[in-house]
């Protein structure tokens, strides 16, 4: 009778362990999905920030360009136009980020790097797996239980 009881307990324990592993995998998948959602939202916020910044910077750039051009014409000193050059680079970059194709170009460049320069992207100890995470978790729990 004890053998039947222990066999049943072993099966229940095995089923519970399988359930826990499955649950841990689901939790990890959910965490990865959540991290991707957070990344997408951060990118959307960056684009929105760039568009909002462009409105204010565009106004400043327009007023500065008109003022500097008027000063250069009035004082007959073309050196007044020099600050327009770096301001135009900033304006162009922000416009390209907010409304242009900068993100698509960055994405295609990143995809190209992923395809052709794979060795530069390798992690120091290789890819993180569920098993390696479990091993580290077990070692950490042993460390805390020893103290």
Swiss-Prot record:
> What is the annotated tissue distribution of the protein whose record heads this document?
Expressed in adrenal medulla (pheochromocytoma).
- Could you tell me where this protein is found in the cell? Cell membrane
Its recorded name reads Plasminogen receptor (KT)
Bilayer-spanning residue ranges = 53-73, 79-99
The protein's matches in InterPro entries, at most eight in alphabetical order, are given as: Plg-R(KT) (IPR019319)
Which species is the source of this protein? Rattus norvegicus (Rat)
Please classify the protein's predominant subcellular localization into one broad category: membrane
What's the superkingdom here? Eukaryota
Q: What does this protein do?
A: Receptor for plasminogen. Regulates urokinase plasminogen activator-dependent and stimulates tissue-type plasminogen activator-dependent cell surface plasminogen activation. Proposed to be part of a local catecholaminergic cell plasminogen activation system that regulates neuroendocrine prohormone processing. Involved in regulation of inflammatory response; regulates monocyte chemotactic migration and matrix metalloproteinase activation, such as of MMP2 and MMP9.
Q: Does the keyword Zinc-finger apply?
A: no
UniProt GO BP: chemotaxis; inflammatory response; positive regulation of plasminogen activation
- One Pfam family here: DUF2368
What is the membrane topology noted in the UniProt record heading this document? Answer: Multi-pass membrane protein
Describe its assembly.
Interacts with PLAT. Interacts with PLAUR.
Ranges per topology, Cytoplasmic? 74-78
Transmembrane helix found in the keyword field: yes
The record's keywords, sorted A to Z, are: Cell membrane, Chemotaxis, Inflammatory response, Membrane, Plasminogen activation, Transmembrane, Transmembrane helix
* Membrane-side (Extracellular) residue stretches: 1-52, 100-147
GO CC terms in record: plasma membrane
Instruction: List the lineage, top down.
Output: Eukaryota, Metazoa, Chordata, Craniata, Vertebrata
């Amino acid at each position: 009778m004890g053998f039947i009881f222990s066999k049943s307990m072993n099966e229940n324990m095995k089923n519970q362990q399988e359930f826990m592993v499955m649950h841990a995998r689901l939790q990890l998948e959910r965490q990865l999905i959540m991290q991707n959602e957070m990344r997408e939202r951060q990118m959307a916020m960056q684009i929105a920030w760039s568009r909002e910044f462009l409105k204010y910077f565009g106004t400043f750039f327009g007023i500065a360009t008109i003022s500097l051009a008027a000063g250069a014409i009035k004082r007959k000193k073309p050196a007044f136009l020099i600050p327009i050059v770096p301001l135009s680079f900033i304006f162009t970059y922000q416009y390209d980020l907010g409304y242009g194709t900068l993100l698509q170009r960055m994405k295609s460049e990143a995809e190209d790097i992923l395809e052709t320069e794979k060795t530069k992207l390798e992690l120091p100890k290789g890819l993180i797996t569920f098993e390696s995470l479990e091993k580290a978790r077990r070692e950490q729990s042993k460390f805390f239980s020893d103290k």
